Amino acid sequence: RQKQLAGTMSGGQKQRLALACAVIHGPELLFLDEPTSAVDPESRRDFWERLFELADAGTTLLVSTHLMDEAERCHRLAILDHGALVADGTPAELTGRLAGRTFVVEADDPRRAQRALADVPGVLGVAQVGNALRVLTGEAAAQDGSTSGVAQRLQDAIAKAGQPARVAAAAANLEDVFVAATRTGRARTERAA
């Protein structure tokens, strides 16, 4: 491939070439913007392995990504919303702050259930994942850790739409953290305006 022009390379090959060019001088700090865009899953794993090797060798990496599964690979995260820092910490710290606020809803008609939940006070986001819904609320669990009050409100809203459903608390993931941080930040901005 020595004579191949960069413009004729695949997305993954271009990304590997860009990384090689970026590290050839042994930088102490490396900024990577969406480093694995247009890269297949296997190449993505290889790419991240190279990044960890660089980190082990002492290079500080700053990675921007909109892919939460990539963000989970990082040691520390900072979530920006319109240029403002709205959350930061380790993946475990960030997801831990959302304990008791995420639910999985299983319903016969997930789209109808999603519409029923859209206007429930305190619901920050509803996303369909497969045949289930992932619901993020702005309300934390009760002091005893119970989420039954929130779960019951969600179930009641869906039942009111004539849709039987099962609602269960779920562990938060980084996508939930991102949605909570950016929606909460927007609400603050809208109130200030």
Q: What residue spans do the PLM features occupy?
A:
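ABC transporter nucleotide-binding domains
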Residues: 1-80, 87
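Solvent-exposed, non-membrane alpha-helical residues enriched in polar/charged side chains
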Residues: 52, 92-95, 155, 179
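Short, flexible active-site loops
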Residues: 74-78, 96-101
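Conserved beta-to-alpha transition
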Residues: 82-84, 88-94
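Short, charged/small-residue-rich alpha-helical element at the C-terminal edge
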Residues: 99-185
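ABC-family P-loop ATPase nucleotide-binding domain
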Residues: 184-193
